[in-house]
A protein has these predicted regions:
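Short helix-loop "hinge" at the ATP-lid/N-box region of the Bergerat-fold HATPase_c
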Residues: 41-42
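Disordered, acidic interdomain junction associated with two-component signaling
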Residues: 6, 33-36, 82, 138-169
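Short conserved segment of the HATPase_c
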Residues: 79-93
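Glycine-rich G1-box
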Residues: 2, 77-78
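Short alpha-helical Gxxx[C/S/T] motif in the catalytic ATP-binding
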Residues: 103, 108, 112
Length: 169
């Protein structure tokens, strides 16, 4: 966020059509993936650029499953067609012109792809050299069908103690 603020990069976040709020999956993996994608969106953006992030639920044919779609679109420098072929390979970096000024190990995208695939998801992208990149990540999640029951139990007690109450008279 600090680098985005210094470069005056605007970040817009939109949650659309999310039905199920309690899902079973790996929040740590999702966080790591999104951090890698957003880090690149900021790092390879332009001053006064823009990053658009969205999250949308895509219903599944299986009643206990759903898919979350994350989109990250930036107005950055984009990727050459040649680099797009190897963006998910370890240590791959684009070394053309001003790109060499961007520090990195070339591991962020391969790690993100591996984590997404471990969760049973997919990652695709479109990029235009000089115009920006859009990543689309789809990850399946199991719906926590028991969350409603746990919520009902919480509502019954309301967190109030029965200490000192005369229940049986």
């Amino acid at each position: 966020e600090q680098i985005a603020a210094e470069q005056n990069i605007q970040i817009e976040w939109e949650k659309k059509e999310i039905i199920h709020r309690n899902l079973i999956g790996s929040p740590g993996y999702v966080k790591r993936v999104m951090m890698n994608i957003l880090s690149n969106a900021v790092k390879y953006n332009r001053a006064n650029g823009h990053i658009y992030i969205s999250c949308m639920e895509i219903p599944s044919e299986q009643p206990e499953m759903t898919t979350m779609e994350f989109v990250c679109r930036d107005t950055g420098i984009g990727m050459t067609e040649e680099f797009q072929k190897c963006v998910f390979e370890p240590f791959a970096q684009e070394h053309t012109g001003s790109r060499t000024k961007f520090a990195g190990t070339g591991l962020g995208m391969p790690i993100a792809k591996k984590l997404i695939e471990t969760m049973g998801g997919t990652i695709t992208f479109e990029s235009e050299n000089g115009a920006g990149t859009t990543f689309v990540i789809r990850i399946p999640f199991k719906i926590d069908l028991n969350s409603d029951k746990r919520e009902e139990k919480k509502d019954v007690s309301d967190g109030k103690s029965i200490k000192g109450m005369h229940i049986l008279r």
